[in-house]
Amino acid sequence: MKKGKIVLGLCGFCLLLSSCGSSQNATVGNNTDPNNHSVSTTSMSRETSDIQYLKKDLENGTVSIWYFETSTPQDTIAIPEEINGKTVSQIGERLFEGNEEVKTVILPKTVRAIGNSAFNFATTLEKVEISGPVEILENSSFYGCNSLQELNFPDGLKKIGDHAITACSSLTDLYLPGTVEEIDEDNFALCGEPLKIHVPAGSETEARLQEIMKSNGDLNIQIVEE
């Protein structure tokens, strides 16, 4: 059984999963723990396997996914837009950290933030489909994703945190919108040789990238104006 992340102290959750057996599209009620995390099984299936999620309720009424579990190995994970009627707005920290099976992750248009180390060392990850305006990439969110060849962020991205896109050795093309206001200078090292960063000409994003290149002459990046 493949786990999205190791979680300690979830004995009740394990018992719940074992009670589901091999039934398909099982529905699990809201079993909220004292820390305000709840167990949810979505009706979305890929082939014959359901994906179980643990979510964390956020103050704005949306949820963050901080754990997932599948009954069989799956190379594609499509994150749902909603869990139990609540909008999924965040990919929780370390959700896919160290994952060695998933090749494609499909994010819904509702996601606004990708948490700390969310895809850290997800070494088999080849593709992330981003359809909505993700605003924040937290620290080390894509660190060490050695199978990624391209990342494309739509308009709306504002912040790229510390080492968010670093040590992605196969990454050759990164597409950034002109909306990026903050890029930590500890990014883009140990990526493709060179890493081509596609940005709108004359944008704030391009100006920030130029500053980073001046302060770190060892970075092997190429700005491609579009």
Describe each model-derived feature in a short phrase.
Residues 92-95, 115-118, 138-143, 161-166, ...:
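Consensus positions within tandem repeat domains that build extended binding/scaffold surfaces
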Residues 64-66:
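Non-globular, low-complexity intrinsically disordered regions
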Residues 166, 188-190, 209-214:
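A structural signal for leucine-rich repeat
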Residues 16-19:
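C-terminal motif of bacterial Sec signal peptides marking the signal peptidase cleavage site
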Residues 29-58:
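N-terminal low-complexity, Pro/Thr/Ser-rich intrinsically disordered segments
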Residues 52-60, 72-89, 100-113, 123-136, ...:
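Structural signature of tandem-repeat unit edges
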Residues 21-24:
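Bacterial signal peptide processing site
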